[in-house]
């Protein structure tokens, strides 16, 4: 290779180097500009990082503060939960005690042996009373039949009238011979005739008063007494239905067959109350009427005094019957083995807290209102 070629090659290499140098300088300028821009971006980023770190610090402090407050709230809540747990345990103990008392009361309520014994005793007493009333009914029927039989009195009146006619005929035969005596005798006979007429009128008035007033008054008194018996029967049936409904609601089933049979046996006894009421009236009535009949046969002038005695007997007998029924009701409604609730008036084997809760009361409020000595069980009555 010649020198010229070397020189040309070096010139070409110098030109290429110059171009490369220019390109490198251009690139260096661009790189410096990019470095400057990146430095500016880094500065901005550093500032942003600083601000973000400050915000993070504030946020961390806020989270720490919130954590402390939350921990305090949790501690307070745990304390409340512990207190509520103690209250719940106390309530649980109270409910368990109440459940024991309630189970005892239910067992007492379900024990109706005493009630069945009382019902059996009542049935026996009512059967005996039924027999007594039947005997009174027979006596009353016999007395009424005796009072209605006045054939002997009518026969005596007929005999008396025939005797009066015979005497009058005898005096007429002697009239011609003994005018003066006959006139006097006629006057005496006329007076006696007037007396007989007055006696007959008094007897007719008494008979009319007895059959129209006394007997009707007696029948009305009997009807009133039968009406009272019917009202009492209706009240008894209403009370029986209420008791059956209460027993069904309380025990959750109907009354047993044995109790139903007891009630069925009690109904015929009540149905015979009308006959028994008539039997109660009969002795006094029969005595008064028989006394009046004897006074008619012996002393006609005292006929009117017998009526008031007969008139007063049915009412007195009815009052005695009502007093007897009232005493029997009192004895039935106040059994010895039960105690009365002062609020509702019903009888129970014991006045318990669950029952008083139905009246919006407690045992202490019940004692405050009706006294500390108010009985809660049958043993407390003594």
Curated annotation (Swiss-Prot):
Organism: Halobacterium salinarum (strain ATCC 700922 / JCM 11081 / NRC-1) (Halobacterium halobium)
SUPFAM superfamilies: Bacterial hemolysins
Subunit structure: Forms homodimers, interacts with GvpF1, GvpH1, GvpI1, GvpL1, GvpN1 and GvpO1 via its C-terminus (residues 329-382).
Compositional bias annotation for Low complexity: 303-316
Stretch list, region 7 X approximate tandem repeats: 22-284
UniProt repeat feature Sequence, residue ranges: 22-60, 61-92, 93-130, 131-168, 169-200, 201-240, 241-284
GO molecular function, one term: zinc ion binding
Name the UniProt record assigns to this protein: Gas vesicle protein C1
Feature: compositional bias, Acidic residues: 260-302, 317-336
Residue spans of biased composition, Basic and acidic residues class: 1-18, 365-382
Region (Disordered), start-end ranges: 1-21, 260-382
Summary of the function given for this chain in its UniProt record: Confers stability, involved in shaping gas vesicles. Gas vesicles are hollow, gas filled proteinaceous nanostructures found in several microbial planktonic microorganisms. They allow positioning of halobacteria at the optimal depth for growth in the poorly aerated, shallow brine pools of their habitat.
Misc. remarks from the entry: Encoded in a 14-gene plasmid locus called p-vac which produces predominantly short, spindle-shaped gas vesicles during all stages of growth.
Conditions for induction: Maximally transcribed in late log phase, probably part of a gvpC1-gvpN1 operon. Also part of a gvpA-gvpC-gvpN operon. Gas vesicles appear earlier when grown in static culture, possibly due to O(2)-limitation.
GO BP term, example: gas vesicle organization
Compartments reported by the entry: Gas vesicle; Cytoplasm
Biotechnology: Can be used for presentation of peptidyl epitopes in the mammalian immune system. Modification of this protein to include a 6 residue epitope elicts strong antibody responses without the injection of extra adjuvant. An insert carrying 168 amino acids of gag from simian immunodeficiency virus in this protein evoked a long-lived immune response and immunologic memory (IgG) in the absence of additional adjuvant when injected into mice, suggesting it has the potential to be used for vaccine production.
Keywords assigned: Cytoplasm, Gas vesicle, Plasmid, Repeat
Family affiliation: Belongs to the halobacterial gas vesicle GvpC family.
A Pfam family recorded for this sequence: ROS_MUCR
Disruption phenotype: Many small variable-shape gas vesicles, in situ. Makes increased amounts of gas vesicles, their shape is highly variable, in H.volcanii.
InterPro entries assigned: Gas-vesicle_GvpC_halobac (IPR008639), ROS/MUCR_sf (IPR041920), ROS_MUCR (IPR008807)
GO cellular component: cytoplasm; gas vesicle
């Amino acid at each position: 290779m010649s020198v010229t070629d070397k020189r040309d090659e070096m010139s070409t290499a110098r030109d290429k180097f110059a171009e490369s140098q220019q390109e490198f300088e251009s690139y260096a300028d661009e790189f410096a500009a990019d470095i400057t821009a990146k430095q500016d971006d880094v500065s901005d980023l550093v500032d942003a990082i600083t601000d973000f770190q400050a915000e993070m610090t504030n946020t961390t402090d806020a989270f720490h503060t919130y954590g402390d407050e939350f921990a305090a709230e949790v501690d307070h809540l745990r304390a409340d939960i512990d207190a509520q747990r103690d209250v719940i345990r106390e309530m649980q103990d109270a409910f368990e005690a109440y459940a024991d008392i309630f189970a005892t009361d239910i067992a007492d309520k379900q024990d109706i042996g005493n009630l069945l014994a009382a019902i059996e005793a009542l049935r026996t007493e009512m059967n005996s009373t039924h027999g007594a009333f039947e005997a009174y009914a027979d006596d009353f029927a016999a007395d009424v039949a005796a009072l209605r039989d006045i054939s002997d009195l009518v026969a005596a009146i007929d005999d008396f009238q025939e005797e009066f006619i015979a005497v009058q005929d005898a005096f007429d035969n002697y009239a011609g011979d003994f005018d003066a005596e006959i006139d006097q005798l006629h006057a005496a006979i006329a007076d006696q005739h007037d007396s007989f007429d007055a006696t007959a009128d008094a007897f007719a008035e008494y008979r009319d008063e007895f059959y129209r007033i006394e007997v009707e008054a007696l029948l009305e008194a009997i009807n009133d007494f039968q009406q009272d018996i019917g009202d009492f029967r209706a009240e008894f049936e209403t009370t029986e239905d209420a008791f059956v409904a209460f027993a069904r609601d309380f025990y959750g089933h109907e009354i047993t067959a044995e109790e139903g049979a007891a009630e069925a046996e009690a109904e015929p006894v009540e149905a015979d109350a009308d006959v028994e009421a008539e039997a109660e009236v009969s002795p006094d009535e029969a005595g008064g009427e028989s006394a009046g009949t004897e006074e008619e046969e012996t002393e006609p002038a005292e006929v009117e005094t017998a009526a008031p005695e007969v008139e007063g007997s049915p009412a007195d007998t009815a009052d005695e019957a009502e007093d007897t029924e009232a005493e029997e009701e009192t004895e039935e409604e106040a059994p010895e083995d039960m105690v009365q609730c002062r609020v509702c008036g019903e009888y129970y084997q014991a006045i318990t807290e669950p029952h008083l809760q139905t009246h919006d009361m407690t045992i202490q409020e019940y004692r405050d209102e009706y006294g500390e000595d108010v009985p809660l069980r049958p043993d407390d009555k003594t």
